[in-house]
């Protein structure tokens, strides 16, 4: 799944291991954002309560090429009253992780609205988005193709690289693979921006 980023290159091999990336975790309330964050940090399930403001953690992740990368995550509350604050956190971000509840069909339209709203902000144009389809372990979860259709992923700006990743945050399935895809997209974008600067 994704829009033209299947030709992942070996840019990763040239990346210094000390590099840090600013990542914002967004999504509706109860989608599993904080569960994703703490599963990545502690590699175990942490029982969480709804986030009233934000959580922030620096997490070192070893990617498939054995390089260790630091992600500075900002997990922002998803309640409706907190969503106007999202744009403050996405300013100058390297990537967005948007978590959706694969079981909650009734709120998928609401998730679509918020996803499209945040990616259309001028400062977020071109920022890579990892859509985390959480709770894929549940029998009544939507398929990836259904989620892609309900979120109208094809209607995102052509300048917005994205990847839809099936996950189960409770046991951690799919999270590392998703981060690797996000990392690839970020590196690809940075390379493109550097090339554009040289042409000026």
From Swiss-Prot:
GTP binds at residues 27-34, 75-79, 134-137. Changing residue 34 to N: Inhibits relocalization of CYTH2 to the plasma membrane. Strongly localized in the nucleolus. InterPro entries: P-loop_NTPase, Small_GTP-bd, Small_GTPase_ARF, Small_GTPase_ARF/SAR. Pfam families: Arf. PROSITE patterns: ARF. A lipid is attached at residue 2 (N-myristoyl glycine). One of its GO terms (molecular function) is GTP binding. Myristoylated. It is found in: Cell membrane; Cytoplasm; Nucleus, Nucleolus. Its main location: membrane. SUPFAM superfamilies: P-loop containing nucleoside triphosphate hydrolases. GO terms for cellular component: cytoplasm; cytosol; nucleolus; nucleoplasm; nucleus; plasma membrane. Gene3D superfamilies: P-loop containing nucleotide triphosphate hydrolases. One of its GO terms (biological process) is brown fat cell differentiation. Keywords: Cell membrane, Cytoplasm, GTP-binding, Lipoprotein, Membrane, Myristate, Nucleotide-binding, Nucleus. Small GTP-binding protein which cycles between an inactive GDP-bound and an active GTP-bound form, and the rate of cycling is regulated by guanine nucleotide exchange factors (GEF) and GTPase-activating proteins (GAP). GTP-binding protein that does not act as an allosteric activator of the cholera toxin catalytic subunit. Recruits CYTH1, CYTH2, CYTH3 and CYTH4 to the plasma membrane in GDP-bound form. Interacts with CYTH2. Interacts with KPNA2; the interaction is direct. Does not interact with ARL4A. Belongs to the small GTPase superfamily. Arf family. This is ADP-ribosylation factor-like protein 4A. The lineage of its organism: Eukaryota, Metazoa, Chordata, Craniata, Vertebrata.
């Amino acid at each position: 799944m994704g829009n033209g980023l299947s030709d992942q290159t070996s840019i990763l091999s040239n990346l210094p291991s000390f590099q840090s990336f600013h990542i914002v975790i967004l999504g509706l309330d109860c989608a599993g954002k904080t569960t994703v964050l703490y599963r990545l940090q502690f590699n175990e399930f942490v029982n969480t309560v709804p986030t009233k403001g934000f959580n922030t953690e620096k997490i070192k992740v070893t990617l498939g090429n054995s390089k260790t990368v630091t992600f500075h995550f900002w997990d922002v509350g998803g309640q409706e009253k907190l969503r106007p604050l999202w744009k403050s956190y996405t300013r100058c971000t390297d990537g967005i992780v948007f978590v959706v509840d694969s079981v909650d069909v009734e709120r998928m339209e609401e998730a679509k609205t918020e996803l499209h709203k945040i990616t259309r902000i001028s400062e977020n144009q071109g920022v890579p988005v990892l859509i985390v389809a959480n709770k894929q372990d549940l029998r009544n979860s939507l398929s990836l193709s259904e989620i892609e259709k309900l979120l109208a992923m094809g209607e995102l700006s052509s300048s917005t690289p994205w990847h839809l990743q099936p996950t189960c945050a409770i046991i951690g399935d799919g999270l590392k693979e998703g981060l690797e895809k996000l990392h690839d997209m970020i590196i690809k974008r940075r390379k493109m921006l550097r090339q554009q600067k040289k042409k000026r």
